[in-house]
């Protein structure tokens, strides 16, 4: 497989799996302090439930004040935690723009006409074959006869068109997965395996 195609696939994998960095950011921004406060409140609340306000008024009142303090602390720490996670995700989004989106877009423009594979000439109407070979620009220039077909018995499929088709397929699969995940998580997991095999097959081609 051509080096440029492998590079495009690498960018594609990075683009489609970048959302995992958000999960990683959530894990790295440890909510340990928040969890500790929540556990403390749960334990104190259980203790408070077992006390009688009449028989243990002083302790019951003290626990109530402590619960109020814990509620405020939990709200403050949760807010700080969520802000920290969002700030990390924003930095990751900027990083993606620099290391994935911009280079990937530039590469697609630079190598968009690179032949990926060939189809027998005559399989599709001339207009479609011209688009497969020259990309979307052919649609605008075809009436002017400014784009010519390559000689031979086959029509080369350009990298830009191949990538467009692959992204459309992946987008459709992602939509189906999201729909299944909402309806049946187990079915979504099985479909995800099919998705992985499809991506592997595309890489092999």
UniProtKB/Swiss-Prot annotation:
Assembly notes: Component of the Golgi to ER traffic (GET) complex, which is composed of GET1, GET2 and GET3. Within the complex, GET1 and GET2 form a heterotetramer which is stabilized by phosphatidylinositol binding and which binds to the GET3 homodimer.
Protein purpose: Required for the post-translational delivery of tail-anchored (TA) proteins to the endoplasmic reticulum. Together with GET2, acts as a membrane receptor for soluble GET3, which recognizes and selectively binds the transmembrane domain of TA proteins in the cytosol. The GET complex cooperates with the HDEL receptor ERD2 to mediate the ATP-dependent retrieval of resident ER proteins that contain a C-terminal H-D-E-L retention signal from the Golgi to the ER.
Per the record, the similarity remark reads: Belongs to the WRB/GET1 family.
Coiled coil located at which positions? 32-96
Q: Where are the transmembrane segments?
A: 4-24, 97-117, 157-173
UniProt keywords (A-Z) are: Coiled coil, Endoplasmic reticulum, ER-Golgi transport, Golgi apparatus, Membrane, Transmembrane, Transmembrane helix, Transport
Report the protein name in the record.
Golgi to ER traffic protein 1
Q: How does it sit in the membrane?
A: Multi-pass membrane protein
Q: Which residues lie on this side of the membrane: Lumenal?
A: 1-3, 118-156
**What is any one of the record's Gene Ontology cellular component terms?**
endoplasmic reticulum membrane
Q: Which gene encodes it?
A: GET1
For the Cytoplasmic compartment, the record's topological domain ranges are 25-96, 174-205
* One example of a Gene Ontology biological process annotation: tail-anchored membrane protein insertion into ER membrane
Q: Where in the cell is it found?
A: Endoplasmic reticulum membrane; Golgi apparatus membrane
């Amino acid at each position: 497989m051509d080096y440029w195609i492998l590079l495009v696939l690498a960018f594609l994998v990075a683009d489609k799996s970048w959302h995992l960095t958000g999960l990683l950011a959530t894990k790295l921004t440890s909510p340990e302090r928040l969890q500790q406060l929540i556990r403390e409140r749960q334990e104190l609340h259980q203790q408070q439930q077992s006390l009688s306000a009449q028989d243990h008024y002083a302790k019951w009142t003290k626990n109530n004040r402590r619960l109020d303090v814990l509620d405020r602390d939990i709200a403050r720490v949760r807010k700080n935690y969520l802000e920290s996670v969002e700030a990390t995700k924003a930095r990751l989004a900027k990083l993606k723009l620099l290391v994935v989106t911009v280079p990937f877009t530039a590469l697609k423009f630079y190598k968009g006409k690179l032949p990926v594979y060939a189809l027998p000439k005559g399989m599709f109407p001339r207009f479609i074959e011209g688009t497969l070979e020259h990309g979307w620009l052919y649609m605008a220039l075809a009436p002017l006869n400014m784009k010519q077909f390559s000689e031979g018995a086959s029509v080369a499929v350009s990298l830009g068109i191949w990538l467009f088709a692959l992204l459309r397929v992946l987008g459709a699969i992602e939509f189906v997965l999201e729909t299944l995940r909402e309806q049946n998580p187990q079915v979504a997991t099985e479909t995800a395996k099919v998705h992985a095999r499809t991506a592997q097959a595309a890489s092999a081609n």
